[in-house]
Amino acid sequence: MALLALILVTAVWGVTFVQVKDAVEIYPLFAFLAVRYAIATGALALVGGRRVGTLGRPGLAAGTVLGLLLGLGIGLQTAGLERTTVSSTGFITGLYVVLTPLFGLVLFRTRLGLEVWLGVTLAVVGLAMLSGVHVGSPGGNLLVLASTSAQALQILMVERYAPRYDAIALTLVQMAACFVGFLVIALALGELEVPRGWTVWGALLVTGVFASALAYLIQVWAQRRLSAARIALVFSLETVFAGLFGYWLSGDRLGWLGWGGCAVILAGIVVAEPSAAATLRRLVGWRPTLLPSD
């Protein structure tokens, strides 16, 4: 159940790459993010606002840390999305499947096997291929990579905090921290204005309710049952959905080298997490067929 819910979350994130890219072309970036997380905060407050009192100071601090990491990741990702393509953004974002165990090693002394280092190498090669084929800009791709690092840290910290606190309350504080941070930036830049048009409002409602409030509530709930490494593995499916929706809805054309880079990144993801193949086989119901011998 947790795995299926996370797959649906990645599908929502994949399609919102296209919506967000269209929206921030006509509406200021940080104003968009402030309104998005205001909607997410309001949605969660309606169903669980009273639960925040159960967190105490440690829980409030934990939610704030998660919110700051999440906000940093989303802000950098959206800024990168303004400068590069939907497909590139989606595939580079998938690198957190290898960055998550790497940061786990540095912060929590989690052991890594040789396959993880090989996966990281493949992912870096794939990123280089993507950045060198005139798909968006290298600067935009680097912004997305920086956002991926923040998201990897957020996944690790959710693993530590999720078992300790109420899921709705912790997620609500996360969303509120993001809202306050983006509101301050939007005000400082003079970007805050009333959203207009269905392109902007549609993106705000979908990302606020489904891609933020519901998605991160599901993450906190699921990380009581699944490890950070497995969460990151499932989240890598976002790269597949982003590529598909970017191709179908946004007309992205990566070319053979760009798609080759995407394939190398995905190969790195699978190599870094050996259970990926088995997990994907279970998801699609695939079973190998043994050929009869002569």
Q: What are these model-derived regions, one by one?
A:
Residues 1-8, 39-66, 106-117, 133-140, ...:
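Membrane-interface interhelical linkers
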Residues 12, 16-17, 45-93, 129, ...:
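Specific transmembrane alpha-helical segments of multi-pass solute transporters/efflux pumps
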Residues 33-35, 89-95, 157-180, 212-248:
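Helix-helix packing/entry segments at the starts of transmembrane helices
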Residues 56-61, 90-93, 106-126, 137-141, ...:
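Loop-to-transmembrane alpha-helix entry segments
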Residues 25-72, 76, 99-103, 150-157, ...:
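Transmembrane alpha-helices of multi-pass small-molecule transport proteins
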Residues 44, 64, 70, 112-131, ...:
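Hydrophobic transmembrane alpha-helices of multi-pass small-molecule transport proteins
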Residues 1-4, 37, 127, 200-202, ...:
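C-terminal-most transmembrane helix of multi-pass membrane proteins
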